[in-house]
């Protein structure tokens, strides 16, 4: 007779946990204040806007003074994702995957015209018409490319949004599923359509 105890399955944790949801209003203010001034940023740099992002992080503009810590080791350590540059349909699944690897609560700044709506390449067959077709965006920074001061203004707008954020409002609505956001251009081929079928393989 097997006497091995059955493993106890813990309930699936909610995104923020019951304690964070039940926190009194003053505690929520403290939580929002902490998130607001300790944003580890992950830059998904795709084009010339990424150069302006780097300029904003250097000594002249220095967005560290706003509480934004640049160059997180990876998406799993990041709170803020800045998408800067042209997002192509082939790159879209990678953007979505990196976004999903970020822990909650997470924020996205769309930096530049290409990231906002496709920019000068909007009519190309291979360009995604805005990163908000793939992931939710919190702040849009217009420009082609935007100046570093524009990114600083976008960061301040995001911090204002975080300061008045309610956890129930942010996480009350379900996020779109990954399947709903996949492009037909990047779907794997159906089974039996590749090499080795009856037409191309040995008979």
Curated annotation (Swiss-Prot):
Protein topology in the membrane: Peripheral membrane protein
Transmembrane segments: none
Cofactor binding notes: Binds 1 [4Fe-4S] cluster.
EC number, as in UniProt: 7.1.1.-
Keyword Hydrolase part of the UniProt annotation: no
Keywords annotated in UniProt: 4Fe-4S, Cell membrane, Iron, Iron-sulfur, Membrane, Metal-binding, NAD, Quinone, Translocase, Transport
Any one GO cellular component localisation term in the record: plasma membrane
Family statement: Belongs to the complex I 20 kDa subunit family.
Known function: NDH-1 shuttles electrons from NADH, via FMN and iron-sulfur (Fe-S) centers, to quinones in the respiratory chain. The immediate electron acceptor for the enzyme in this species is believed to be a menaquinone. Couples the redox reaction to proton translocation (for every two electrons transferred, four hydrogen ions are translocated across the cytoplasmic membrane), and thus conserves the redox energy in a proton gradient.
Subunit record text: NDH-1 is composed of 14 different subunits. Subunits NuoB, C, D, E, F, and G constitute the peripheral sector of the complex.
Protein name per Swiss-Prot or TrEMBL: NADH-quinone oxidoreductase subunit B 2
Gene assigned in the entry: nuoB2
């Amino acid at each position: 007779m097997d006497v091995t105890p059955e493993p106890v399955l813990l309930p699936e944790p909610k995104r923020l946990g019951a304690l964070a949801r039940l926190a009194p209003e003053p505690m929520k203010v403290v939580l929002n204040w902490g998130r607001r001034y300790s944003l580890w940023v992950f830059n998904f740099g795709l084009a010339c806007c990424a150069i302006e992002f780097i300029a904003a992080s250097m000594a002249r503009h220095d967005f560290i003074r706003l509480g934004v810590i640049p160059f997180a080791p990876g998406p799993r350590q990041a709170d803020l994702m800045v998408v800067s540059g042209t997002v192509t349909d082939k790159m879209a699944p990678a953007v979505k995957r990196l976004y999903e690897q970020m822990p909650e609560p997470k924020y996205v700044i769309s930096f530049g015209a290409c990231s906002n709506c496709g920019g000068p390449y909007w009519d190309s067959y291979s360009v995604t018409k805005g990163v908000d077709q793939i992931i939710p965006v919190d702040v849009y920074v217009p420009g082609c490319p935007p100046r570093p001061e524009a990114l600083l203004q976008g960061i301040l707008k995001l911090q204002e949004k975080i300061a008045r954020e309610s956890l129930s409002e942010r996480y009350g609505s379900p996020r779109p599923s990954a399947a709903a956001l996949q492009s037909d251009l990047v779907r794997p081929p159906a089974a039996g359509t590749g090499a080795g079928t009856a037409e191309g393989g040995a008979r």
